[in-house]
Amino acid sequence: MKFESASKFKKQIKKLYRTAFPANERAPLFMLHSKTKHINNSFCAIIDNNEFIGLVYTISNEKWIYVFFLAVEESMRGKGYGTSILKHIQSENPGKTVALMIEDTSDKTVPNYDERIQRLKFYQNNGFKQLNISINEAGVDYELLGTDTNVTQQDFLNLMRGFLGSKLLYKYLYRKMNKQ
């Protein structure tokens, strides 16, 4: 399995990105590509045996690495690629906490509750813990997971402020952050 620049696989990246993430959960692709010019951001296509498997977008600093987007082609799911990608990220960033967001699992009335719990269990099986940090992004409630509990709400906000800039961060994404 190889991690290659997403710019080499724009067509496959675009297709997977649009099918794996609802429109209200996607950042503009042009922005993601342009932000990879910064040393702390990485947008990769996952390739195995010359076949496109998935995508991963990460943002990092000296303390931790945030998995902004991770998706595996539907036909490749259930074959261990998600776990392999997460293990690769962890092995390439020794000493750093790896964190990511999933849709909030506290509301049992949402239509995709079982899917949310299944996703939570997948990440827990890969060493992630619930950090008790809730984030509302573009009207969707999320919870932050991490491989260690040393990531705080302020850490997350600072990382995203560095990525998006203060005005964009407030205006579009993080008007509501709650630590439960």
Q: What are the residue ranges of the model-derived segments?
A:
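C-terminal "cap" of GNAT-fold acetyltransferases
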Residues: 115-116, 136-180
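Short hydrophobic/aromatic beta-strand element in the GNAT-like acyltransferase core
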Residues: 41-45, 55, 142-144
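Conserved GNAT acetyl-CoA-binding A-motif
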Residues: 93-115
